[in-house]
Amino acid sequence: MRQTKTGILLANLGTPDAPTPEAVKRYLKQFLSDRRVVDTPRLLWWPLLRGVILPLRSPRVAKLYQSIWMDGGSPLMVYSREQQQALAARLPDTPVALGMSYGSPSLESAVDELLASDVDHIVVLPLYPQYSCSTVGAVWDELGRILARKRRIPGISFIRDYADDSAYIDALAKSARESFARHGEPDVLLLSYHGIPQRYADEGDDYPQRCRDTTRELVSALGLPPEKVMMTFQSRFGREPWLTPYTDETLKMLGEKGTGHIQVMCPGFAADCLETLEEIAEQNREIFLEAGGKKYAYIPALNATPEHIDMMLKLTAPYR
């Protein structure tokens, strides 16, 4: 009997190909056209997206990307490639492909790469620790569309999330302890997660609970008193209410009330990107310091650290 050959598909959000208005516009158009991300009726959304949002946001966002762009491309792409290569090095007999929901390399190119390696079974690991319909759900949807076009469909194991997985929590805790050793223990450790519209949660998305699960387990692992840890949500977009409290408003409040030393971690980001390196490490630092805060440090994402790769090995092991 032929032994099953398994491949691993690491999935993440995606990134523009270049820090230019044209490349950013292409990326944002694909991203903001996904109903999992924005579910506004199309007759209302298309004119707003194409006539207002893309022309206005693309040049501004391109400048932000230019401020963080690396020699190998966008940080998200650089670190994602490093993750793929590190995991592949640990699993020499298992093909590992990288696919993005938006931009390049696409999820379809990743599936094709694995099928070309003659795999019978694909383990899909969306690198979103906390499930949300707007992230993990988008990977699920696109995977279904891709496979619907294939004559040969492999077996699929889909890892929904890993918000309270012990290897993930241990990796976060080690990263936080290293930051504490470098900068001193902060007055407040702020855990900033990407926000979603409150309406999504009201309609059944359990993302807020999965963020709370991560926060609870991380606080326990670090042995910090609850009053020294805060959970907030960043990157809100549009006018409808998003999950609260908002990260920027919380940092302003903490600075104004005299909190001296803040360290910020973004547990929901598996790789550093625009939202961490520019929004959190730069914009929100300024907000806190201008409000009266004294010391601010951003704790990097897990990226391709050995502990993060160990976690990926553990999560995929039952399916390999």
Swiss-Prot record:
Gene Ontology CC, one term: cytoplasm
Pfam family, one: Ferrochelatase
Reaction(s) this enzyme catalyzes, per UniProt: heme b + 2 H(+) = protoporphyrin IX + Fe(2+)
Main subcellular localisation: cytoplasm
Keyword match Transferase: no
Known role: Catalyzes the ferrous insertion into protoporphyrin IX.
Name used for this protein in its record: Ferrochelatase
The species this protein was found in: Salmonella paratyphi B (strain ATCC BAA-1250 / SPB7)
